[in-house]
């Protein structure tokens, strides 16, 4: 007998298939694409800072780095600062951590959730710096750069995910503790940005991790919007108080 392939039937069958999802509701995808894009962007920006004389490190940092005194006038700095780095070691550590954490988290959370955790953690880091800086002090004019706030948000997300699945969290707790000590004791390290990223990353990832199974997408979207609005509101309030 000869079989006849019905094109329309095949299309309907494919359309009716449900997208495979991870345990936390993210779409199953191959590879950590967002992680690779974020690492690539940071590396390219740093290469521009170093290799092209016209795009000097100081020029990019002054235009895109976070400075509390300029935040209300140039709000893009809250996020663009996360794509700049001060030196090779700064870039190397952050990109290594992003590569390792992103490679583990992105497949579990899904691309859009992972992206939101990363960007909101970066915003949270800048917001914490903003609130803990004062016009009467040098901190108000201090330039801050780096993806560390976002990376600390990923540390927090890793802790949340491991707790959600009942896994041992002692390793990630020890790693965060070591980095926290370095943040507080090291020179020219913004512990405020690290703390802000850690807190926001934990909140956002907890929303994703413990959202009711039947309402994961709705709760995830609502929670993401709520956190973003809260951070913007805090930034606006700080601007009014300064």
Regions found by a protein language model. Give the residues of each.
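N-terminal TM1-TM2 helical hairpin plus the immediately adjacent luminal interfacial "cap"
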Residues: 31-145, 184-192
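Alpha-helical membrane-inserting segments
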Residues: 44, 48, 124, 128, ...
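Membrane-interfacial alpha-helical segments at the cytosolic side of multi-pass membrane proteins
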Residues: 92-113, 119-120, 152-164, 199-211
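Membrane-interface helix-boundary signature
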Residues: 28-35, 76, 89, 168, ...
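C-terminal transmembrane module of polytopic alpha-helical membrane proteins
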Residues: 1-27, 184-242
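Central hydrophobic cores of alpha-helical transmembrane segments
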Residues: 119-121, 171-180, 220-228
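Perimembrane helix-loop junctions in membrane proteins
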Residues: 53-57, 137, 165, 212, ...
